[in-house]
């Protein structure tokens, strides 16, 4: 970034302090410009939600090339949510600390390995792991049902696993479970709220809330909480699927 752009970002961080500032860097031909954006977060001292209208205004001017936000009274160390959102935007993120005035840039990491992912609801969660498994193993893009709120709590109407497994391409099947089947579970909730993938050797690949993604033996606790096992209909060798 050019010094003029950095100066504009620091001035915005100072003006918004102790709230998090947010904005974008845009490029038009050889001209680089910082666009301050409104932070619409309900907790602006802890998080940022960049105004879609302000983002669109920057896009109208040129090409958005980076996302910017500040960490008030903290270092530039990115949180797991920062990293996950950077991955999702496919753009560099510039993080500034204020009042220290430090600057750090993080880059999108691409597709993460299936094991030992950090948990970030709405990004790296149980359905996110299932999506990545099918993308990495079969080249299949499943529908993205991820949301960043605890939809399994009774105060929310959503019931994604129970309502959406069929429309997403999964089917009941005849015969025993096999590698690649989707295991839908109900864990400390009144709804089906967790899922994993069966692996060879009766292992379960899953990503539990607040934990790293992992492989565990499928039995006992997880088997007792299993509500349904289904199979993706369009994978070669899955002819046992029902219509």
UniProtKB/Swiss-Prot annotation:
Gene3D superfamilies: Cytidine Deaminase, domain 2 (3.40.140.10), endopeptidase domain like (from Nostoc punctiforme) (3.90.1720.10). PROSITE patterns: MPN, NLPC_P60. The active site is at residues 126, 194, 206. One of its GO terms (biological process) is symbiont-mediated cytolysis of host cell. It is an enzyme of class 3 (hydrolase). A motif (JAMM motif) lies at residues 69-82. It holds the Pfam family NLPC_P60. Keywords: Host cytoplasm, Hydrolase, Late protein, Metal-binding, Metalloprotease, Protease, Thiol protease, Viral release from host cell, Viral tail assembly, Zinc. It is found in: Host cytoplasm. Residues 96-233 form the NlpC/P60 domain. Its EC number is 3.4.-.-. GO terms for molecular function: cysteine-type peptidase activity; metalloexopeptidase activity; zinc ion binding. PANTHER family: CYSO-CYSTEINE PEPTIDASE (PTHR34858:SF1). Belongs to the peptidase C40 family. This is Tail tip assembly protein K. The gene is gene 19.
